[in-house]
């Protein structure tokens, strides 16, 4: 890697870190690491961004905005014992909510999310090329609906459409937990 490329990547990382802090309106710790995807730790307030070679600035902007959505809207509470829902189910519903809220807060972000998810879909980031999406479990289809549903057709039965709508209508974390419990219960039945 030449000096220009290394310097450009460093500046880009600094810019994305500053963007995260500005959007979150707090002095988050922003780390750039060799990880599979971005994440945000609500307890330590650490936002981790992956070092991807093939992703555009638009994808990084979306990753930053998504994780800032968690920083702004996902509370740091211990809900696992009380609700007894696997975190992966809550994350699917919470992702839909925080993306809706961050796009509502920053009017320029809907286009960023649209373009970034289009790019990720084009790169087969979700590894769907050899799969029939309709054969996937409901939680996976729900997740895909809210991420790349603009670019693929996903079939849902009547009850699943109700759960999709409930997910899209969540405004509070308490509502996320209620809907997540319904999604989890349905998925358990789906496996029987």
Which residue stretches match the model-derived regions?
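Short, functionally important secondary-structure microenvironments
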Residues: 1-192
């Amino acid at each position: 890697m030449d000096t220009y490329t290394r310097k450009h990547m460093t500046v880009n990382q600094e810019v994305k870190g500053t963007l995260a802090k500005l959007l979150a309106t707090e002095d988050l710790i922003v780390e750039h690491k060799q990880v599979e995807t971005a994440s945000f730790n609500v307890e330590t307030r650490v936002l981790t961004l992956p070092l991807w070679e093939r992703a555009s600035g638009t994808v990084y902007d979306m990753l930053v905005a998504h994780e800032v959505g968690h920083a702004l809207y996902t509370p740091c509470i211990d809900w696992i014992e009380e609700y007894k829902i696997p975190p992966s189910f809550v994350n699917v519903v919470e992702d839909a909510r925080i993306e809706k809220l961050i796009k509502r807060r920053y009017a320029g972000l809907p286009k960023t999310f649209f373009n970034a998810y289009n790019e990720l879909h084009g790169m087969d980031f979700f590894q769907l090329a050899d799969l029939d999406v309709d054969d996937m479990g409901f939680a996976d289809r729900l997740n895909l609906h809210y991420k790349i549903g603009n670019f693929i057709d996903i079939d849902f039965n009547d009850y699943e459409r109700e759960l999709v709508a409930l997910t899209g209508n969540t405004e509070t974390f308490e509502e996320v937990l209620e809907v997540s419990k319904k999604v989890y219960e349905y998925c358990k039945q789906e496996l029987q």
